[in-house]
């Protein structure tokens, strides 16, 4: 099925400016959506009840990644043009710290057990010397830099087996990082061009690849294995799991008819 447009929210900068990652802060007092508005170097804040623009968090050069952990009351951004990550207290949107990381930070993942933020960096020029910076959130410093085999994309932390998974565009793999040892532990061959969006649900990884395919990977039983492949109507981006409806949504910018 496809979603239907039901409304439009006007944001600063006009209709044709670029956006990137987004995440939600879900609390009973009023949930909010935070959207990386890359073209305006800001994160736009939207009221989820009224579908109204509230304000922007400014001075985030080239902001790309947005990640929220509601339980920890933390909002993270990757400020690509500044080669840093920013850490906010989400409830009042106050800036806690800014930490320098590798060149052109992009996707983010948060180890909730150790309070380590993983910043996946595209390198300079993009796609060369790619790294993951592991940031100690409470100490506001980089603990370790991990070399990556290619350009990173979306990433997730899996608390159940203490791994961080990140899509690598080329080679077409999902890289697993041991969150305790802070080192690469496994490479999962996706078997489709350009792993892009990545989700985790019910003990499975869902990898949306540029080759118009969704790979479903079981990663509990020994070596992770692809258990199913589903065709997509175009080149995908982010994936989102709706736990209540048990549905996985895959964003496709230009779907085929």
Predicted segments with their positions:
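Predominantly soluble domains enriched in secretory-pathway, periplasmic, or organellar proteins
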Residues: 1-257
């Amino acid at each position: 099925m496809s979603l239907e447009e039901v409304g439009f929210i006007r944001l600063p900068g006009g209709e044709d400016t670029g956006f990137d990652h987004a995440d939600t802060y879900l609390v009973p007092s009023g949930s909010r959506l935070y959207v990386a508005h890359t073209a305006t170097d800001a994160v736009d804040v939207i009221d989820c009840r009224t579908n109204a623009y509230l304000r922007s968090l400014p001075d985030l050069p080239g902001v790309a990644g947005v990640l929220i952990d509601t339980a920890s009351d933390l909002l993270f951004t990757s400020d690509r043009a500044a080669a840093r990550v920013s850490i906010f207290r989400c409830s009042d949107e106050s800036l806690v710290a800014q930490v320098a990381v590798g060149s052109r930070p992009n996707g983010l993942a948060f180890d909730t057990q150790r309070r380590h933020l993983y910043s996946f960096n595209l390198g300079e020029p993009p796609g060369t010397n790619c790294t993951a910076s592991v940031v100690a959130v409470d100490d506001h410093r980089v603990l370790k830099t991990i070399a990556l085999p290619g350009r990173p994309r979306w990433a997730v932390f899996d608390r159940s087996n203490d791994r961080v998974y990140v899509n690598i565009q080329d080679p077409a793999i999902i890289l697993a990082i041991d969150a305790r040892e802070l080192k690469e532990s496994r490479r999962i061959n996706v078997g489709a061009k350009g792993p892009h969006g990545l989700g985790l649900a019910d003990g499975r990884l869902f990898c949306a690849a540029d080759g118009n395919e969704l790979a479903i990977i079981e990663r509990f039983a020994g070596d992770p294995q692809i258990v199913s492949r589903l065709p997509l109507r175009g080149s995908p981006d982010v994936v989102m799991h709706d736990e209540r409806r048990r549905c996985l949504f895959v964003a496709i910018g230009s779907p085929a008819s």
